[in-house]
Amino acid sequence: MDYKITGYEPAQLFHFFEEVSAIPRGSGNEKGISDFLVAFAKERGLDVYQDEVYNVIIRKPASAGAENAPTVMLQGHIDMVCDKLGSVEHDFTTDGIDLVVKDGVLTANGTTLGADNGIAVALMLTVLDDDSIVHPALECVFTTDEETGLVGAETLDKSQISARTMINLDSEEEGVATVSCAGGVVVTYTCPIVREHKTGSTLTLDISGLLGGHSGNDINLERGNGNLIMARIIDRLMVAGEPAIVSFNGGTKDNAINRECKAELVYADHAAAEAAAQIAKDIIADVTAELEVFDPGFTCTVEIADDAEVEAMDQKSALALIRALRLAPNGVIRRNVATDGSVEVSSNIGVVATSDDEVKIMLSPRSSITSLQNEFKDRLQTLADVLGFDAKFEFEYPGWSYAEHSPVRDVFVESYRELFGSELRIESIHAGLECGLFAEALHGLDAIAVGPTLSDVHTPDESMDLASAERFYELLIDVLKRLAA
């Protein structure tokens, strides 16, 4: 293929990233990339395992002289979050990612880049492909459906893994090692809708321009959530009059902070719609001022169309929807004030979708403390009961606790110091990592999560610092050499 990324070493690392990016691999659509990995292994005579959900393990024997060193697992996920700007035409089920290189930064043309976690795939393929590297026996574990709830890692038969040292490659800041993470669960509220025929003038509200972001890593940044802003506007309009809601749709991923939301209301006549439009514009002005520092790109258009005939939600259905969005917890719920103020409990209202007969709200609560996670789930169930929603709790995953003693952490700290002359920062994150599932299943697992610098993951602004990826590969190879000694 004609490679776009040039001038960075090793060239093969970036070539593999481009090859991976050419394969559609949204969550739930990983067969193509999984089969690519199997073919890669077979072409090189490496042992390979593929399961029914397309997880892949590729095993490579230790390099000469390192046969007695403990086996090391390298791990990352092969799926990506699929999100795009509304103006971009892109079919994630059939189209590869259109890469853009500018000033040392890699992005995509109006879509998510997929460096989360495509760079991990490329890193492992490069290590497996290069027989000059000194390393212990390797088990490269490629998991599926991480972005929808760590599904592949949960499903994987852990007896296939002999390693008790794990290097997870799904961290997003160079110079930082993650050593513990939050657990979480996907919560889906559903409620039936009753519709009734309405005529009059429609008022369409369309929110865009918000930064969005990862609902764990970015939840503390006070960014706007399109679903909540829309609910705020409609709540005020319902106090001022009685609009009927035709539709309310925002977000596609529970684990992404919502950037865009669109709602359609219907009023009896143009005058009523015009009065409501002015109220909406006043609230939009307030929100714009409130988000000036944290989310300055926020916009919301207001349009009126006359002579409409629609099937709108009845008042009871509309009230249930807006009350749920106004009352459901969102954002930072609790911080660890005893240490660094890091987030301990949070929630994100990522998706609101109305169909002909149902409304669905998807939330992503997280906590680094199991008891608080359980208590928060109880609160969400109580709220659902009060509002008349059905609540479903799915894809729950455990947190990963900090280990006082960690040889692999010590090796990374020493290697980073000697290579770059500075200290590796050790952190915990408020997001789910597959490390928690592996640590739960593999007794005595010594794990660390690392990676090059990525920005704005899960959004169309996602980017990767190419020089950072270059340096990170140097660090990884040095660590493997030390672990082989």
What name fits each language-model region?
Residues 5, 10-13, 337, 344-360, ...:
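Zn-dependent metallopeptidase/amidohydrolase metal-coordination segment
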Residues 223-248, 402-445:
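Active-site-adjacent substrate-binding region
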Residues 18-22, 253, 264, 299-312, ...:
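A short beta-alpha structural unit
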Residues 3-105:
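Acidic/His- and Gly-rich active-site-bordering loop/insert found
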Residues 196-200, 219-249, 268-346, 380:
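Acidic-enriched catalytic cores of C-N bond-cleaving enzymes acting on peptides and small amides
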Residues 159, 223-240, 270-273, 317-326, ...:
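His/Asp/Glu-rich mid-to-C-terminal helical/loop segments that flank catalytic regions of hydrolases
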Residues 136-226, 234, 238:
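Fold-level recognition of mixed alpha/beta catalytic cores in primary-metabolism enzymes, strongest
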Residues 66-164, 190, 199-202, 315-318, ...:
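Active-site metal-coordination/substrate-binding segment of hydrolases
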